[in-house]
Every structure is written in C-alpha cells, then in structure tokens.
C-alpha cells in the first residue's frame, strides 16, 4: 500500500520533473505545420488555466515573459472580472463550467465533502495525507468513475451531452469533468494495478474525443505520461497539437492546464513562474501554424482562469484556522473511520472554506455557528433552516436571512427575499436592487453550496489571509490558497478571440450557454 500511495499520490498530486519526450517525434511535429483553410463554421477551443490571475498575467506580459498570452490578448477581448463558482475549488468550478449550473443542481459540493446518505467522507484529491487516511483506492475510484458517472447529477446536462444532441462533436483533454454520450475505456497503468486492488480498466461516458493522461490518449506517440501519470500540461498540449495537425479538431474542445495552480500554492499569488511555463506550451501550439495569426482563422479561442488565489499569512499559528481545535468540545469523526453513534460532527476543509456537518441529534447547528463566530479570522458562517439561509458574522450585529424569489433583484436578474443585516455579505441596496461588493453573485453562489447536499451542515468562509485546516488538510501558509467566496478568490481573467459575440453575464456558470448559442 505504501508503494501505491507513492505512485498515485506523488505522481498525480505533486509536480515532478519535466516530462520526457522523444526528440524525433518532436522534430516531426515541428515539420508538420497546419494548412489553414476556410470552414463553414468556427471551432471553439476553451483553455482553462488553473489559478490564472489578472495581476501576474499582466506582469508576465509587460515583462515579455508570456508572448503567446500577449498575442491572444492583443487579438481578443479581455476582462478580469469573470465570476467563479463556489466553493472556489476546481471540481466545483469545473462542474459549473461544463453544466452551466451551480452545486445545488450539479451536486458537486466541493473537493472534499460528507455524503450524508452513505455516511462517508468523499474526496477528489485534497492533499496526499488526507487521501492516505480516507483510502487511495476510494480516491482513485472517485476520480476514475464516481465523479462523472455517479456523483454528477443526472438532472443536469454537460456541454458535451448538449452538443451531441445538436449533432456536434466535442473533445475533452485532461479535464476531470467530461461526461458525454460515448463509451470509453480508461486503462489503469499496470504499475499501479500490480500493487493495488484497482481494476485494470474503468468504463466511462465522455465526449467523442477523450484524453485523460495515461488513462486514455489520442496520440499514441504522446510520451508525456511520466510526470503525474500524464495529468500535466505537456501531455495536454501535445494532444491538442495532434488534433490540430490531423485536422480532427471537433466543433468544441476543452483543454485543462493545471500546473500553474501548484506553483501559485507554493510561491504565492504574485508569482509569474507558472504563467511563464504554461506560455511556452501555448507557443508550441501557435508554432504549428504557418503564422500565429493563422491560429485565429475559423478558431475561437477562449482562455479563462478557474479561480483566483489569495495570499496566506506566513505565520502558521495565525494563518491556519484549526477547526478541530475550535470545535474540540465536540466528538469529531476521524478520517477513514466509520461513523459511530458517539460521533457528533464532521469537518471537511476546502482550503479557505469548510463544511461542518451535524451527525448527532444532540448537537445544535446554531451553537456550532455561535462558537465559530468568536474567531476573528472567519468572515461569516451560514446554515439553512427550511427554505431560508441564515448568515452571521463576528464583525456585524444580528443576522442576514435570504431565499430565492421575492421583490429584490440583483444584476443577474435573480429575484430574492432578504431581511436582516446586509452588511454581513457586503450587499448594498438601492430601490430594491441588490449590488454585490466583496462577494460577487454571493446570494446565488452561497445558495448553491447550501443546497448542494442533504443533511444539516454549516458553511464557513475565511477572511483573506487565512485558511481552514482539519485533521490532515493541506496548508499553504506563506503561499496562496482559494476556496472562499471573497472576490480575491472569485474574480478571474477571460480572453476571447475570433468573435465579437458578447457574454451577457460574466460568470463561469454562463459560459456553457454562450458557447452553445454559436450553433443555435
């Protein structure tokens, strides 16, 4: 089991050395340039760059360290205010992006959460030590099968499913959410199956073209599968180049570029190192065209970040909000242990936000909230009572209560019933109109998290500079972290080239409809 942990946890979760490719193959790639031809309809390439942020992006461009991104920016439209999903964790964001729905509909609550029906903690990869305690096999099964085929609600449709119904083809490269209508077989590397109880194959449903590291690839000569089992940027870019060179790029392609996230977590939000590295990969893609400008012919490029990151205080004792310590009077479910009759609460920390679950009738959700309200590092605490969401804060008197429907409207034309102290979520009101300040689209995003799962639970959100930890949570003191609803974690850049078609609402949850409208 130790060997398996090293293979999966380190290979998948930790960036290793640069992938080893075949030089002859790389030379062949350079020679095989694309011949541009006119097409009847444009093709859309969506590049999702994990933790791409406005300030380091602009800095890298100004210092001429990101010529590919500078090229796209020069030839496109730009905004730094695309609103992410909530929690601002990749799996939830990916779910909103690909389904056009918040977690109340997609049912993907976060990177780690407690399944009230199964009475177990689910993780999609929140740090090596947490995975070790919860079980590597269960984690692998979640990623390989459960996530797309079970957990993602059947009541929402992915962009791949909608495109299939429109008789359009699509591709997914290294994106963990990819559900579609085509049957695929994911093959687990033999090195892993030999030392584990994982099956050799997983059956899954995806788009017509699916690439996911060493588990499934289109280019059999793509040798970038050593580093993180192919779940790396070099692998992803080689797959995109292959589709372009073979002229098999479908109407829609989503490509996930992940490694910048690891760099920002370690070095902090100001670093440009990750951007400089990923830009070299984008240069590889542009270089296969006779001229970079040819890449824009009949191709619409959409480049987005998924979440921002905010700096975490260097001093661990101050930076890390230890929820086990704060709630030490309660009996807390241990990671990897079955629920016992004496257990009272479950803690699942998602970096700068956390879910705290009541699993014993003797516990009061309000009492837990009241206890957490005394910690000055926590921005606010929320829970639900019937159809109403209640929010309190240590910085403000009283409470704020809201639910969907009512006489108040926000800039997204969403109607709400609200009462109480609006300062808690930094809302301002004018003539029945709601304006968001520190928490963009705060009501819909918080409602989405509160309705994402069953049971009684609390949502806690940290102030900038602080991060929650549970039993074995990863921590990023001195670096960067995300997860919260605050604008520092929530506003990301977007670059769009090749079209003047406006996006009605600058939210990740709205991009699916905007893309599908190209073929309506």
Q: What is the predicted role of each segment?
A:
Residues 2-23:
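Sec-dependent N-terminal signal peptides of Gram-positive bacterial secreted proteins and lipoproteins
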Residues 22-78, 84, 88:
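Active-site-proximal N-terminal segment of extracellular/periplasmic enzymes that hydrolyze or transfer
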Residues 50-51, 305-308, 464:
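Active-site metal-binding loops of divalent metal-dependent hydrolases
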Residues 79-98, 173-183:
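Short, solvent-exposed turn/loop segments enriched in Gly/Ser/Thr/Pro and often Arg
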Residues 101-102, 106-265, 420, 427, ...:
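His/Asp/Glu-rich, glycine-adjacent segments
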Residues 151-152, 228-237, 267, 271-281, ...:
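Phosphate/oxyanion-binding active-site loops and adjacent basic polyanion-contact surfaces
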Residues 152-156, 342-502, 508, 512:
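Active-site neighborhoods of enzymes that stabilize oxyanions during catalysis
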Residues 278-322, 327, 515:
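Metal-dependent active-site segment of extracytoplasmic phospho-/sulfohydrolases and closely related
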